[in-house]
């Protein structure tokens, strides 16, 4: 009997912990890939490449680390931005300062565990489908 109660208590604890982990509508880790074109320095020709981007929101979702790079190169950029969330519309924006600063990245939750991220690369608008990795 004691063993059954212990197992039930463990299951209840696990279920409640899982609910606590999923209590925030925005996952804290996202990543995705997108196609880019880069100029070959030797030939001057445009070459297709695949770039990756990841977002890691702080526990309180007030900041976000954006990390990106080209898959077949070793250059990776990593920068922290301020995050502003709109729970009603399930959107977020990232910028370098206060709320009125220029928006550098913006995204919207499209489905459970899916998000569309937008940003400009030069003059070109880039849209990337991101997948979530974990909740906190």
Residues covered by each model-derived region:
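N-terminal glycine/threonine-rich, aromatic-flanked beta-hairpin/loop signature
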Residues: 44-87
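Sec-dependent signal peptide recognition
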Residues: 2-7
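An anionic, turn-rich surface loop/hairpin at beta-sheet edges
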Residues: 87-108
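Tryptophan-anchored aromatic micro-motifs
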Residues: 22-49, 85
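Edge beta-strand at a domain terminus
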Residues: 73-85, 116-136
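C-terminal motif of bacterial Sec signal peptides marking the signal peptidase cleavage site
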Residues: 13-16
């Amino acid at each position: 009997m004691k063993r059954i109660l212990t197992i039930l208590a463990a299951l209840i604890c696990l279920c409640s912990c899982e609910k606590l982990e999923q209590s925030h509508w925005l996952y804290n880790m996202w990543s995705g890939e997108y196609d880019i074109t880069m100029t070959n320095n030797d030939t001057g020709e445009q070459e297709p490449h695949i770039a990756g981007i990841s977002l890691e929101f702080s526990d309180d979702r007030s900041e976000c680390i954006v990390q990106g790079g080209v898959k077949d190169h070793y250059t990776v950029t990593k920068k922290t931005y301020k995050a502003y969330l709109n729970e009603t519309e399930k959107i977020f924006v990232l910028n370098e300062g206060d709320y009125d600063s220029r928006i550098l990245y913006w995204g919207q939750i499209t489905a459970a565990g899916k998000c569309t991220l937008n940003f400009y690369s030069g003059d070109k608008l880039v849209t990337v489908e991101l997948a979530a990795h974990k909740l906190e």
